[in-house]
A protein has these predicted regions:
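Alpha-helical residues within the helix-turn-helix
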Residues: 16, 27, 56
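A short, Lys/Arg-rich alpha-helix, primarily the initiator
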Residues: 1-17
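DNA major-groove recognition helix of helix-turn-helix/homeodomain DNA-binding modules
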Residues: 47-64
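Short alpha-helical DNA-recognition segment
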Residues: 19-38
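Short, charged recognition helix plus adjacent turn
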Residues: 1-2, 56, 66-69
C-alpha cells in the first residue's frame, strides 16, 4: 500500500476515533471541508505544514500519519 493510501485511511480512522467531523477537523486546522474530504479520498495530499497541523490536532506523530515510519 502506498504512503498516500495509508495516509487517507489513518486520517479518516483517527478523525473518527477522536469523534471529530470533517467540519470540526477542517476548522481546527484552518482548511475547507472539501480539502479534508480530498485527503480522506486520497485525491490530494497535504504539504508538510498542514500535515504537522493535522497530526497536532489529532494528537498523533506526523511520521505515523504520513506513513513515513
Amino acid at each position: 500500500m502506498s504512503n498516500s493510501a495509508i495516509f487517507k485511511v489513518r486520517l479518516k480512522r483517527t478523525r473518527k476515533n477522536k469523534n471529530l467531523t470533517q467540519e470540526q477537523l477542517a476548522e481546527a486546522v484552518g482548511l475547507g471541508v472539501r480539502t479534508i474530504g480530498r485527503y480522506e479520498q486520497g485525491s490530494s495530499f497535504p504539504n508538510e505544514r498542514v500535515l504537522h497541523e493535522l497530526a497536532e490536532v489529532l494528537k498523533v506523530k506526523t511520521d505515523w500519519l504520513s506513513a513515513k515510519n
